[in-house]
Amino acid sequence: MDDNKKRALAAALGQIERQFGKGAVMRMGDHERQAIPAISTGSLGLDIALGIGGLPKGRIVEIYGPESSGKTTLTLSVIAEAQKNGATCAFVDAEHALDPEYAGKLGVNVDDLLVSQPDTGEQALEITDMLVRSNAVDVIIVDSVAALVPKAEIEGEMGDMHVGLQARLMSQALRKITGNIKNANCLVIFINQIRMKIGVMFGSPETTTGGNALKFYASVRLDIRRTGAVKEGDEVVGSETRVKIVKNKVSPPFRQAEFQILYGKGIYRNGEIIDLGVAQGLVEKSGAWYSYQGNKIGQGKANAAKYLQENPAIGAEIEKQIREKLLTAGAVAAAAKAAAAEADADDMADADAGY
C-alpha cells in the first residue's frame, strides 16, 4: 500500500474510532487469535465431532429432530455441564412441558435454574433478549420455536389465517438479539420441530418451523435422531441416538456422533469413554475383557462402564487423553480435509442423480 493510501486509511480509522469508539474497526493481525470458548454437550463423541470440545459460546445453536428423539435431554445435559463450571442457565419453556424431576435426574441443579413459561412468542423472545443483555446468563434454552405463537394468533379465532407471522417474528427477534449474544458471550439454543413439505418430489420433504431466519443466524445446527432401542433382556431401557452436524461455522460440518440415552439417566457417557478409548488404543480389549494400563476394569462394556462410574478419576483421566488426542490442530485439519472430500462426493452423487 502506498503512503497516500496509508494516510487516508489512518485518517478514516481515526475518525471511526472517535465516532463509534475504540475497537469499532480492528486489524486482525494486531490481536492474538483466541480459541472459541465452548460448553460441553455431555456427550464426549459429540463434543469431539463439533471440533472445539462442545457448543460455542456467544453463538446461536439450533437443535431439531422428530418427537422423542432426545432434543430436550441433550439441552438439559448442556445445562448440567455448564452448571458444573459455575454457569448461570435459563430455560424459556414455551411448550410449558419442562419436568423438574427429570431435569434433576440428568444432573441439572434445578434450584439454580432460571425458568420462564411465557404466554406468547413475543414475550418469550423479549425475555430471552433481556436475559442476554443482562450479561449475567451463560446459557439460554428456548423450547421450542414451534411453540413461539404470535400474540395475534393467540387472540384470534381458531380458524383464522396468519400467513408468515411466526417467520416474521423470528426474523425480527434474531436480527435484534444476535449482536447482543456475541457481546454477552452467551450460548442460546433454540429447540425446533420437524414438519413435512407437501408435494416434494425430489430431496427431503422435511423442514423446520419458524421460517428460514434461524437457519442463517445459527452457527451450529444439529439434527438428532433415534436410531434404535437399548435393551436389558426384553426391557427397553434407552435409545440409540445419532446426531448429525448439518451446519458448523466454527469447525468442519457434516460430522456425526452416536451415543446412547438411558431413560431417567441421560447420556451414557461412560459407555462413550470405553468405546472411544478402545478406538484410540487407550483402553485394551481382549475378548470380552477391558483393561486400562494393564489393569482389568471389567468383563463386557457394561461392567467396564460401571467400573468408571465407581472410579470417576480414572474415567476423567481417559477422557482427558481422548480430548487431547482428538481435539488437536492436526486432528481438526484432517477432519476438515475429510469433510471437504465427503462434501465433494455428495455433490458428485447429487449431480449423477440429476438434482
Swiss-Prot record:
Identify the PROSITE patterns for this entry: RECA_1, RECA_2, RECA_3
GO BP field: DNA recombination; DNA repair; SOS response
Arranged from A to Z, the UniProt key words for this protein are: ATP-binding, Cytoplasm, DNA damage, DNA recombination, DNA repair, DNA-binding, Nucleotide-binding, SOS response
Per UniProt, subcellular location reads as: Cytoplasm
GO annotations of cellular component type: cytosol
Grouped into one coarse class, the protein's main location is: cytoplasm
GO MF? ATP binding; ATP hydrolysis activity; ATP-dependent DNA damage sensor activity; damaged DNA binding; single-stranded DNA binding
Q: Name one Pfam family in it.
A: RecA_C
Presence of the UniProt keyword ATP-binding in the record: yes
The record's family statement is: Belongs to the RecA family.
Recorded hits in HAMAP family, A to Z, give: RecA (MF_00268)
State what protein this is by name. Answer: Protein RecA
Which species is listed as the source?
A: Pseudomonas entomophila (strain L48)
Q: Which gene encodes it?
A: recA
